[in-house]
Design a protein with these regions (language model features):
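A short, acidic, amphipathic alpha-helical segment used as a generic capping/interface helix at domain edges
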Residues: 187-193
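M16 family metallopeptidases and their MPP-like homologs
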Residues: 41-50, 64, 77-185, 201-210
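Active/ligand-binding-proximal structured segments within catalytic/core domains
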Residues: 55-67, 75-78
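Extracellular/periplasmic catalytic domains that process cell-envelope and extracellular macromolecules
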Residues: 36-38, 198-201
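Short beta-alpha junctions and helix-cap segments that line functional grooves
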Residues: 18-19, 31, 62, 92, ...
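An aromatic/glycine/proline-enriched structural segment found at the starts
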Residues: 1-53, 208-219
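Short conserved micro-motifs at the rims of enzyme active sites and ligand-binding pockets
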Residues: 54-58, 116-118, 156-157, 217-219
């Protein structure tokens, strides 16, 4: 009764989406250094990604799993954490929305190894862009993404968030049933195409926050 008294005379009206300016990655690499008295440097290497309704979303999900979204199996973790010991955590992520969201690789490392870590991130981006992924990497990514899908929505809050995304991006009420087939249908050729199309380390933005006197960047 109190709710109806307070809001009962409210009427629904159509509200259009705001018009946002188009964004794109810079024509050449941009480097931003922020000097802070910290023992560890925080590094973000990123660029403009894609909107969620882009049909390449699923191929890019597989690509990101191989590059830096697959935990200990990802290339970035293997190189930067396991082989070099430069960082405890390193990961990559696409964050698509109604418009193009960011792509970013993020890590923290000692100031003294920040330059080497940046160099390795850029090298791995070039490598996956030029050489693509292997058949084994594709199979592993498909198995994980399809197998873990139900586990991502095992709470009421997660189900509510999924339903919101389904409505917002027009995925269809049958999206949960279709998702495994969308992932399994992908080929190496499709993954390698989106790697060439969407990743360009030479047009990335590199941000390094740390004690700059101890940080030697490779450019």
């Amino acid at each position: 009764a109190l709710f109806g008294k307070a809001f009962g005379d409210w009427g629904a009206r159509p509200v259009g989406a705001p018009s946002l300016p188009a964004v794109s990655s810079p024509p050449t690499r941009v480097v931003r250094r922020l000097d802070r008295d910290l023992t560890q440097a925080t590094i973000v290497v990123g660029q403009v990604g894609y909107p969620r309704r882009n049909p390449d979303h699923y191929a890019l999900s597989v690509l990101n799993y191989v590059l830096g979204g697959g935990g200990f199996t990802s290339r970035l973790v293997q190189r930067i954490r396991e082989e070099r010991g430069w960082a405890y955590d390193v990961h990559s992520r696409f964050s698509p929305g109604l418009e193009a969201g960011p792509f970013a690789v993020t890590l923290q490392t000692k100031n003294e190894t920040a330059g080497e870590a940046v160099r390795e991130v850029l090298a791995q981006l070039r490598r996956i862009r030029q050489d693509g992924i292997t058949a084994e990497e594709l199979q592993d990514a498909q198995a994980f993404l399809t197998g873990s899908f139900p586990l991502r929505y095992d709470t009421n809050a997660e189900v509510a968030a999924l339903l919101t995304q389904m409505e917002l991006h027009g995925l269809g009420i049958d999206f949960p049933a279709r998702y495994p087939d969308l992932i399994r249908a992908l080929t190496r050729g499709e993954i390698n195409r989106v790697a060439r199309q969407y990743l360009d380390p030479d047009r990335s933005v590199v941000v390094v926050v740390g004690k700059q006197a101890k940080i030697a960047l490779p450019f």
